[in-house]
């Protein structure tokens, strides 16, 4: 309101975190503006879901939080990285942890889901990235892993703002948040 109507009329795209308060403020004050979920925050939601699965499976299988020497605890930092950045040694560590126990398959599937989400954002072609994102929206909410299904429901709830990323030439608030 301080900047005036002319400024508000000039705002065409607004990137935001997946927080309902931001969306409500945007709808109230800039109702013709296209809302776009910021890629960093969406990928962070995916990474957080993977970590929640890892911690739950760790607790369920061993009865305690992660400790040095526990397979899933040992890969916790690797799980935060993008698949394209992993060394051969890190890939081998992931594979060893995922195959150590049958229950670890949940962590593997969760990690693959998060990587698919990252791939949508990283794809060089916007149309292909959007197709990957649409597939994510269709598949994650029905995932039998509760944390991943919750992520899928969250993304489905934000569907328009999530998919707007590919319609607005990769709009991001990274520059603003870096200040």
What are these regions (language model features)?
Residues 28-34, 50-55:
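Short secondary-structure boundary/capping segments
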């Amino acid at each position: 309101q301080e900047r005036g109507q002319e400024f508000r009329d000039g705002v065409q795209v607004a990137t935001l975190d997946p927080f309902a308060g931001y969306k409500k403020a945007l709808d109230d004050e800039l109702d013709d503006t296209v809302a776009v979920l910021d890629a960093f925050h969406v990928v962070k939601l995916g990474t957080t879901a993977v970590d929640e699965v890892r911690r739950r499976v760790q607790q369920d299988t061993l009865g305690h939080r992660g400790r040095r020497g526990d397979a899933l605890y040992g890969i916790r930092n690797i799980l935060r990285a993008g698949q394209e950045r992993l060394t051969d040694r890190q890939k081998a560590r992931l594979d060893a942890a995922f195959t150590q126990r049958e229950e670890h398959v949940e962590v593997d599937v969760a990690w693959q889901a998060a990587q698919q989400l990252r791939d949508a954002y990283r794809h060089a072609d916007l149309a292909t990235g959007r197709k990957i994102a649409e597939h994510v929206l269709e598949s994650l909410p029905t995932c039998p892993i509760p944390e991943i299904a919750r992520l899928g429901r969250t993304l489905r709830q934000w569907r328009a703002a999530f998919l707007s990323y590919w319609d607005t030439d990769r709009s991001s608030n990274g520059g603003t948040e870096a200040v």
